[in-house]
Swiss-Prot record:
Keywords: Actin-binding, Cytoplasm, Methyltransferase, S-adenosyl-L-methionine, Transferase. The SET domain specifically recognizes and binds actin, suggesting that it does not accommodate substrates diverging from actin. One of its GO terms (molecular function) is actin binding. Its main location: cytoplasm. Residues 94-314 form the SET domain. This is Actin-histidine N-methyltransferase. Its EC number is 2.1.1.85.
Length: 582
């Protein structure tokens, strides 16, 4: 989170582009909105659409050159002011300092010994930028009228940030001046750097992120120019794409969920000082103390004086880190690759499979994950694959009979196979699927290693290549695991090994050995996509206002199967208004 800015943004008023007529700009904005509001692009033509959208954005950026607002000097010049501001307003500032590290950029360095689980950092609510503080700001009147802002807290925070940045008297200015001028998310990649992500499992999310950001910008550009409640916003005379990209990136890399003051629900917040901590493997050690009304963080481990203080951001994959945080984390224990699976409606046994899956709380089509750790599949994916590969008799056994419910509960437990034949089928299927996915890449792991040795490799290019390399490494591990399991269960079948037996009365309490999951599966939170089905704005409402042509677009989140409360970046916000921005 403390990653330094690498490229200097042009200062307002210096070398500004020639004046562009409002009509000319509105025409370009309308063209961009129309292009970004088209239905899903034809499979295989996503790159073509991305290049077209990018071309329009670059035209707009060229005409807006020199109009973006940035601060004089370097962000680190404002660190003393940030520390003083935090101290004056009740945040902890003792025991650490803000410094630049060789690998991660800016972060917190311990100035004394800090013990594991010691409370070393707290930030009171008054310092946080939240959706609630946005409602009470100059943005409030527009927020009260705009359905998109109401539905999407992350966009509200982005505009809150922009408005406060433009106000020389803003309470949060000491914080805002320490934010990077630019970020390392794919929104800042050039076209050649994005090319390195071609054929990866993450590329569609990269395309979607860019398309969504461009659409949001075009929509709000028109809102700011035409909506009566936007008249007093300090953005009316200058709202550039670079401004919006900076704001959404600041929020995307930093936003967290905190409880509202009464504790009845959660809201999004930017947390000054705390968001300078960089990530490492571990456990969530940040929470919110409602009694003292402040965000608190205890030490993840012992830190000696002079060492960098790390926190754990949550169980994110490297695709999520690259797309939403702008860095690649080596040796990520929670890394995974998305895999889309579904039962075909043309399957003769579709109805029975759908019913068994429904009883287990699993949809017939979803996005799962292959994990870097062993075993590579979660309890939910194991359950899905077992049902996917069941024959008619096995399906009947899970639908009718005295022990049908017990069998549903064991679907996600690796210790209780449905049958040896079923187990062989599912691992054979997974082996074939992983093999097919590997064949979609244009390079091998060895090829990627050679490219990474090139001395002129840009930071963004290296990050993209590392991501595509680790995807292949995960798929190769999954392929080997599937092959080993297929051979094991084939041997059990050939030798006539009896299936493991279980006590029906105790089955719901059996701990699952797959991905640290526990039964029953039906009580587990399954998948990324389920969260995104919540809709705050219907398709009909959007089309009536001309935001979309006829249907919603792909989700832009890469949310994991398991979420953390405070340290996750709340990509569900995008899902809450998926018709507009997903």
């Amino acid at each position: 989170m403390g990653k330094k800015s690498r490229v200097k943004t042009q200062k307002s008023g210096s070398g500004a582009a020639a004046a562009v007529s409002p009509k000319e700009m509105l025409n370009l904005i309308s063209e961009l909105l129309q292009k970004c509001s088209n239905p899903n692009s034809t499979p295989g033509r996503e790159w073509e659409e991305y290049v077209q959208i990018r071309g329009l954005v670059e035209k707009i950026r060229k005409k807006q050159r020199g109009l973006s607002v940035v601060f004089d000097g370097k962000r680190e010049d404002y660190f003393p002011e940030l520390m003083e501001w935090c101290k004056e307003n009740g945040a902890s500032t003792d025991g650490f300092e803000l410094v630049e590290f060789p690998e991660e950029g800016f972060g917190l360095k311990a100035t004394r010994e800090i013990k594991a689980e010691e409370l070393f950092l707290w930030v009171p609510r008054k310092l946080l930028m939240t959706v609630e503080s946005a409602k009470g700001s100059v943005l409030g009147p527009l927020y009260s009228q705009d359905r998109i802002l109401q539905a999407m807290g992350n966009i509200t925070l982005a505009f809150h940030l922009l408005c406060e940045r433009a106000d020389p008297n803003s309470f949060w200015l000491p914080y805002i001046k320490t934010l990077p001028n630019e970020y390392d998310t794919p929104l800042y990649f050039n076209e050649d750097e994005v090319q390195y992500l071609q054929s990866t499992q993450a590329i569609l999310d990269v395309f979607s992120q860019y398309k969504n950001t461009a659409r949001q910008y075009a929509y709000f550009y028109k809102v700011i120019q035409t909506h009566p409640n936007a008249n007093k916003l300090p953005l009316k005379d200058s709202f550039t794409f670079d401004d919006y990209r900076w704001a959404v990136s600041s929020v995307m890399t930093r936003q967290n969920q905190i409880p509202t003051e009464d504790g009845s629900r959660v809201t999004l917040a930017l947390i000054p000082l705390w968001d300078m901590c960089n990530h490492t493997n571990g456990l969530i050690t940040t929470g919110y103390n409602l009694e003292d009304d402040r965000c608190e963080c205890v030490a993840l481990q012992d830190f000696k004086s002079g060492e960098q203080i790390y926190i754990f951001y949550g169980t994110r994959s490297n695709a999520e880190f690259v797309i939403h945080n702008g860095f690649f984390f080596e040796n990520n224990l929670h890394d995974r690759v998305k895999i889309k699976l579904g039962v075909s409606k043309s399957d003769r046994l579709y109805a029975m499979k759908a019913e068994v899956l429904a009883r287990a709380g699993i949809p017939t089509s979803s996005v799962f994950a292959l994990h870097v750790t062993e075993p590579p599949i979660s309890a939910q994916l194991l359950a899905f694959l077992r049902v996917f590969c069941m024959n008619e008799d096995e399906l009947k056994g899970h639908l009718i009979g005295d022990h049908a419910i017990d069998k549903i509960f064991t679907l996600g437990n690796s210790e209780f196979p449905v049958s040896w034949e079923n187990e062989i089928k599912l691992w054979t299927f997974l082996e074939a699927r992983a093999s097919l996915l590997l064949k979609t890449y244009k390079t091998t792991v060895e090829d990627d290693n050679k490219v990474l040795e090139q001395p002129d490799m840009t930071f963004h290019s290296a990050m993209a290549i590392k991501l595509r390399r680790v995807e292949k490494e995960i798929l190769e591990k999954a392929l080997k695991s599937a092959s080993d399991n297929r051979k094991l269960y084939s041997k059990n079948s050939e030798e006539g090994t009896p299936l493991p037996k279980y006590e029906a009365s105790n089955i719901a309490f059996v701990e699952n050995s797959v991905a640290d999951s526990k039964l029953p599966v039906v009580l587990k939170s399954l998948d990324d996509e389920e969260v995104k089905l919540q809709e705050a704005i219907t398709i009909s409402e959007i089309t009536e206002n001309g935001f979309l042509n006829d249907k919603d677009l792909l989700p832009n989140g890469t949310k994991s199967e398991n979420d953390s409360f405070l340290a996750e970046d709340n990509q569900q916000e995008t899902g809450n208004a998926k018709d507009f921005c997903s």
